[in-house]
């Protein structure tokens, strides 16, 4: 018998610890509670308790983490008396479209006359687009001309606006004629355009946050006459819309960056 136990202990080291517990007095052995099936009474078994938590896996501990959040899809007609989600959606889309427009008109490898059209010029009459006060034309592939003969008093302001447009342009003036040499496409120029694209994207995200904040503030005004569950659901919908727009902004930035860097 002793020889058999010795052999088993060699084969299964864990059993050695178990036998040691069995050799201890009953009073020293942790007791495990077992509820009887036939009668509703408590029985006790004198065998060592096994700490179950030792068998927990990292996968089990991580359960619930990183799980995708359930998306919300509210019928806008049902909550239009609380807030117009369609208007919120339109405002967020406007932010997206403004960034696309900015990318297309100002962030191009090759400078074209059309890229100068919407440069904002600060005049005595307010802010005006450059093409409203000057005639823009392409003199050669390396030179753009801006004729300010119709608004000569705005020539200095136009030069300042072109120089500060972020397009790496250094205009020269001859009377009321502004000459804009087109810079060569260098690696530094490409990287500068990418930097501008990131700055414009961050500004778009700031505008998006304002849209979201305004929507949330408007929603708060309805808390007294709307259930908490409904308010919470609408808040989640608005946040979801904002997150989707941010993701789209990032996708356009990535695409523009790839285009600019070649």
Curated annotation (Swiss-Prot):
Single GO molecular function: ribosomal large subunit binding
InterPro entries per record: Ribosome_recyc_fac (IPR002661), Ribosome_recyc_fac_dom (IPR023584), RRF_sf (IPR036191)
The organelle targeting sequence, given as a residue range: 1-55
Keyword RNA-binding found: no
Localization, UniProt: Mitochondrion
Keywords, sorted A to Z: Mitochondrion, Protein biosynthesis, Transit peptide
GO biological process: ribosome disassembly; translation
SUPFAM superfamilies referenced in this protein's UniProt entry, alphabetically: Ribosome recycling factor, RRF
GO cellular component annotations of the record: mitochondrion
One Pfam family named in its UniProt record: RRF
Function: Responsible for the disassembly of ribosomes from messenger RNA at the termination of mitochondrial protein biosynthesis. Acts in collaboration with GFM2. Promotes mitochondrial ribosome recycling by dissolution of intersubunit contacts.
PANTHER family per the UniProt record, alphabetical: RIBOSOME RECYCLING FACTOR, RIBOSOME-RECYCLING FACTOR, MITOCHONDRIAL
Protein family membership: Belongs to the RRF family.
Name the record gives this protein: Ribosome-recycling factor, mitochondrial
């Amino acid at each position: 018998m002793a020889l058999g136990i010795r052999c088993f202990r060699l084969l299964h080291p864990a059993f050695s610890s178990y036998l040691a517990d069995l050799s201890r007095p009953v009073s020293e052995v942790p007791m495990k509670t077992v509820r009887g099936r036939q009668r509703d009474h408590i029985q006790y078994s004198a065998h060592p308790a096994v700490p179950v938590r030792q068998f927990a896996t990292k996968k089990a501990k991580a359960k619930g983490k990183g799980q995708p959040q359930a998306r919300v899809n509210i019928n806008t007609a049902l909550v239009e008396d609380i807030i117009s989600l369609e208007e919120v959606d339109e405002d967020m889309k406007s932010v997206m479209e403004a960034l696309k427009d900015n990318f297309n008109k100002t962030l191009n490898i090759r400078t074209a006359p059309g890229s100068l059209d919407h440069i904002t010029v600060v005049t005595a009459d307010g802010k005006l687009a450059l093409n409203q006060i000057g005639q823009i034309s392409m003199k050669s592939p390396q030179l753009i001309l801006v004729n300010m003969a119709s608004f000569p008093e705005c020539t200095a302001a136009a030069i300042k606006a072109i120089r500060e447009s972020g397009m790496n342009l250094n205009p020269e003036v001859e009377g009321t004629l502004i000459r804009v040499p087109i810079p060569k496409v260098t690696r530094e120029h490409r990287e500068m355009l990418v930097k501008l694209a990131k700055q414009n994207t961050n500004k778009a995200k700031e505008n998006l946050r304002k849209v979201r904040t305004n929507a949330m503030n408007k929603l708060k005004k309805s808390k007294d006459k709307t259930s908490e569950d409904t308010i919470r659901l609408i808040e989640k919908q608005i946040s979801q819309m904002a997150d989707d727009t941010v993701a789209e902004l990032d996708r356009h930035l990535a695409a523009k960056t790839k285009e600019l860097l070649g």
